[in-house]
A protein has these predicted regions:
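Acidic/histidine-rich alpha-helical segments that form the ligand environment
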Residues: 78-85, 154-186
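Short, conserved catalytic/metal-binding motifs centered on acidic residues
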Residues: 86, 118, 201
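Histidine-centered active-site/metal-ligand motif
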Residues: 121, 197, 204
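Carboxylate/His-rich catalytic cores and anion/metal-binding grooves
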Residues: 112, 116-136
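Transmembrane helix-bundle signature of multi-pass membrane transporters/permeases
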Residues: 114, 196-201
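Inter-helical turn/loop segments and adjacent helix faces that build the functional surface
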Residues: 96-108, 132-136, 177-196, 211-213
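Terminal targeting/low-complexity segments that flank the catalytic cores of oxidoreductases
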Residues: 1-109, 130-146, 152-159
Length: 213
């Protein structure tokens, strides 16, 4: 009896957590143009990534302009990598949602919203690439294909993919809170992109833990 009661209590707790996630998602919903971009542009007179992430301050042979340019190139790659991993994350969450189609509808809604957020993030990072690419020097190449990476990752077990996803979303939060948010010298739009990204991922990581069994 105790084991049955514990199981039922756990299922009830999980249902409550899914419900809270859905409520939070509805309150925090944002749109790229309406809430973030608003016809803004990147400030190329500033660094994009903080030195704490880029480690550019260790390259003492660079002058100020060179260090700033390298920070912007690294910021461009940083955004590209997030766009790349969002591809397999959105696909995996859609897969997870299928398990709830005839079961917990709040869990299904939470996962569909999660997937929609990841698709929105991919669009945002593509927009960033276009905007940054029009100002930065020619010659920059992106080698990894998001679909190839997604296929390779999704070939692993569900446990492994959810573990990877959870850890990615944990370091997203750490990077933003500890390294990006406190730095006033960074490009304001670059900071805001990762502020909005962080808002979603702080909710997503709770779903990762619920699905990661």
């Amino acid at each position: 009896m105790n084991s049955v009661a514990t199981l039922l209590s756990s299922e009830s707790d999980n249902a409550d957590r899914y419900a809270r996630i859905v409520r939070s998602a509805k309150k925090a919903e944002w749109q790229i143009d309406r809430d973030l971009m608003q016809e803004r542009s990147f400030d190329f007179s500033r660094k994009f990534l903080p030195d704490g992430l880029s480690q550019i301050d260790r390259l003492t042979f660079l002058d100020g302009a060179e260090a700033r340019l390298l920070s912007q190139i690294q910021g461009r790659t940083y955004a590209y990598l997030f766009g790349l991993v969002e591809r397999f994350i959105s696909a995996k969450m859609l897969d997870q949602g299928r398990a709830h189609v005839f079961d917990n509808q709040l869990a299904l809604e939470a996962l569909v919203r999660f997937s929609n957020d990841e698709i929105k993030h991919q669009e945002l990072f593509r927009r960033m690439e276009t905007m940054m690419g029009s100002h930065l020097p020619a010659g920059y190449r992106q080698v990894a294909d998001p679909n190839d990476v997604a296929r390779a990752v999704l070939a692993a077990s569900t446990w492994s993919v959810l573990a990877l996803t959870c850890h990615i979303e944990l370091f997203v939060q750490a990077h933003y809170v500890q390294s990006i948010a406190p730095r006033e010298e960074l490009c304001p739009l670059f900071k805001d992109v990762f502020k909005f990204h962080w808002k979603d991922e702080s909710r997503h990581v709770v779903l990762d833990e619920l699905e990661w069994k």
